[in-house]
Structure formats: C-alpha cells, structure tokens
Design a protein with these regions (language model features):
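Nucleotide-activated donor-dependent transferases that construct or modify glycoconjugates
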Residues: 2-18, 45-47, 71-77
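Residues at the starts of beta-strands that form the adenosine-phosphate
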Residues: 6, 39-40, 198-199
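Short, well-ordered beta-to-alpha junction loops that form the rim of enzyme active sites
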Residues: 12, 46-47, 117-118, 177-180
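A short, glycine/small-residue-rich beta-strand->loop->alpha-helix junction that serves as a flexible
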Residues: 12-26, 54
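Flexible loop/turn segments at secondary-structure boundaries
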Residues: 15-18, 49-52, 121-123, 181-185
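A short, Lys/Arg-enriched amphipathic alpha-helix followed by its capping loop at the start of a domain
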Residues: 27-39
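A conserved catalytic-core segment of Leloir-type glycosyltransferases
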Residues: 43-170
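Conserved nucleotide-sugar donor-interacting segment of glycosyltransferase catalytic cores
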Residues: 151-201
C-alpha cells in the first residue's frame, strides 16, 4: 500500500468487540506499521438497533458526527448523505471510534459508518440481487429469508454510495470484507461502474 491509502473494513463488529474480528481491528488500529501506510480507515456495518441515545451509537469510545436516526443533521454531512438516505430509504450514522493500546499508548480514531437497513427500499435491493446473479451467479432467493444474509445484502449499495460521498471512490481505497458479512459490500464495490475500488476477502 502507498501513502494516501484508505482502508475500509466491512464488519459486524464496527462498534463493539463480539469475537475475533474485534481483536483484529484493535490490533490494526493500534499498530504503528498499519497506521503508517493506511492514511485513512473507515469501519462499515449495519446499525443493529435504534434504541438508546445518540451518544451511545458508536460505543463508549465513539463520537457521533451525524445521525439521521437521531435528528443530528449538521449541514456538511447532510448534503453528503441525504440523497443516499432518500434513494435507499436507509438511516445513516457517521462518526469516529478511538482505539488505544494501553500498553504502548498508541491510539487512532478511524471513521465509522453505520447504516440502518431495516426499511430499505426493495427496488434498489432487488436490482443489486439481480446484478449479483448476472455477474457472480449468486442466487439470493435461496437465502434472502435469512436476515443474517439479507441485511448485509441491503448494506452493500448504500454503503458504497456513502463511501463515495465521503470521497473514497478511487484505486487508493481498499474494501476489506471481514468474514462473509462484508462480501456484498465488496461485490458492490466491484460492480459500481463509477469507482475504482480494490477489494480483499
């Protein structure tokens, strides 16, 4: 990776450590060699709940900068996200989380992008499923009754649209799928005709 590289981590552990991926992320974001070559890091995942206050959305070490689900709509971010939210019928939470290695003192604050996909418009979702079938042979009708599958398919298109709105649509951006949950977003990154993302699984 060269300087100026943005690394997007698509994961179900964007906000809290649940299992192994959380430990991996903690290691990345407090590792000097990673921080030296990754100019920008963004965590992407679904918003699992709208319960609680806006201050709790990104966990105890998080700072929420924008949250349409809570009515926190600063103009700079609203311009970037409003069209995406209307088109896909999703909510967006955006901010930062701080990761610290208590032994070394190394810390960093990657961006966090969460998307509430519970009420997604069916049109764009079905179009994405069609494109996944045509290009990759993925038969979503076999799995879409499983929310564990469906929510991550719904995440893909608005996540890539939001990343583009945040200024990351070029070859210096790497979309990393952590486990199967990130695959639909990585596939949308490949399918998007106006982007030049690189992808890793």
């Amino acid at each position: 990776m060269a300087m100026g590289t943005t690394v997007v981590h698509v994961t179900h552990e964007a906000v809290g450590k649940i299992g192994g991926i959380g430990a991996v992320l903690q290691g990345f974001f407090t590792c000097p060699s990673y921080l030296k070559i990754a100019d920008r890091s963004i965590l992407v995942g679904p918003l699992f709940t709208t319960e609680g206050s806006v201050q709790e959305r990104l966990g105890p070490d998080g700072e929420v900068l924008y949250s349409s689900v809570d009515g926190l709509l600063p103009s700079g971010y609203r311009v970037a996200f409003e069209r995406i939210e209307r088109y896909y019928n999703v909510g967006i939470v955006y901010g930062r989380r701080t990761f610290t290695d208590t032994e070394t003192g190394v810390s960093s604050s990657p961006e966090v992008l969460l998307i509430d996909v519970r009420h997604s418009d069916r049109g764009p979702v079905n179009d994405f499923k069609r494109r996944m079938y045509e290009e990759f042979g993925i038969q979503s009708q076999r799995y879409e009754h499983l929310w564990e599958y469906e929510q991550y398919v719904r995440l893909g298109p608005p996540a890539i649209a939001a990343l583009k709105a945040l200024g990351t649509p070029n070859e210096s951006t790497i979309v990393v799928s952590h486990e199967f949950m990130g695959m639909p977003t990585a596939l949308e990154a490949i399918l998007d005709p106006n982007s030049d993302f690189r992808t890793v699984f």
